[in-house]
């Protein structure tokens, strides 16, 4: 993920200008990294080190999504719809 794509995601999902810490932004950035790493692992099937990193990122995203669903269910539903996440 390059700097321009990262800024684009922050602008789209941030609650204000320069908002990088909100759960929505963190989940969006993690989702982008997860998708990129998933494509990498389709080609490099034996890269177990990266696979572990992927699983850790998925767990971190799951925790942020759980937090967001507890805090504000509407923001949670909007986010998973925009990102195309299941559940």
UniProtKB/Swiss-Prot annotation:
Pfam families: Ribosomal_S15. GO terms for biological process: translation. Coiled coil: none annotated. CDD domains: Ribosomal_S15p_S13e. InterPro entries: Ribosomal_uS15 (IPR000589), Ribosomal_uS15_bac-type (IPR005290), uS15_NS1_RNA-bd_sf (IPR009068). One of its GO terms (cellular component) is cytosolic small ribosomal subunit. Keywords: Ribonucleoprotein, Ribosomal protein, RNA-binding, rRNA-binding. One of its GO terms (molecular function) is rRNA binding. The keyword Membrane does not apply. Part of the 30S ribosomal subunit. Forms a bridge to the 50S subunit in the 70S ribosome, contacting the 23S rRNA. One of the primary rRNA binding proteins, it binds directly to 16S rRNA where it helps nucleate assembly of the platform of the 30S subunit by binding and bridging several RNA helices of the 16S rRNA. Forms an intersubunit bridge (bridge B4) with the 23S rRNA of the 50S subunit in the ribosome. NCBIfam families: S15_bact. Belongs to the universal ribosomal protein uS15 family. This is Small ribosomal subunit protein uS15. The lineage of its organism: Bacteria, Bacillati, Bacillota, Clostridia, Eubacteriales.
């Amino acid at each position: 993920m390059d700097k321009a794509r990262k800024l684009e995601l922050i602008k789209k999902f941030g609650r204000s200008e320069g908002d990088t810490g909100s759960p929505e932004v963190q989940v969006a950035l993690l989702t982008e990294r997860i998708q990129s790493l998933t494509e990498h692992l389709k080609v490099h099937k034996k890269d177990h080190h990266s696979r572990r990193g992927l699983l850790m990122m998925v767990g971190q995203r799951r925790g942020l999504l759980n937090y967001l669903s507890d805090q504000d269910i509407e923001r949670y539903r909007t986010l998973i719809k925009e990102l195309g996440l299941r559940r």
